[in-house]
From Swiss-Prot:
Residues 24-61 are annotated as: Disordered. Residues 23-53 form a propeptide. Pfam families: FSAP_sig_propep (PF03032). Residues 1-22 form the signal peptide. It comes from Phyllomedusa sauvagei (Sauvage's leaf frog). This is Tryptophyllin-1. Its main location: secreted. Keywords: Amphibian defense peptide, Secreted, Signal. The keyword Signal applies. It is found in: Secreted. The keyword Secreted applies. Residues 36-55 have a biased composition (Basic and acidic residues). Expressed by the skin glands. One of its GO terms (cellular component) is extracellular region.
Length: 61
């Protein structure tokens, strides 16, 4: 019975450790994707501002 308790405890402990590692990786992936989305949005906003500031390539006379 003692061996069964130890093995069950070990299995639960290892399961919790693996879940915590997966959660950390998921958070890091989410952070990286959020950063790339923010950079993309900033780049898009900058290009939209540039489009507004530039006159059209042709000007009607």
């Amino acid at each position: 019975m003692d061996i069964l308790k130890k093995s069950l405890f070990l299995a639960l402990f290892l399961g919790l450790v693996s879940i915590s590692f997966c959660d950390e990786e998921k958070r890091q992936d989410d952070d990286e994707s959020n950063e790339s989305e923010e950079k993309k949005e900033i780049h898009e906003e900058g290009s939209q501002e540039e489009r507004r500031e530039k006159p059209p390539p042709w000007v009607p006379v």
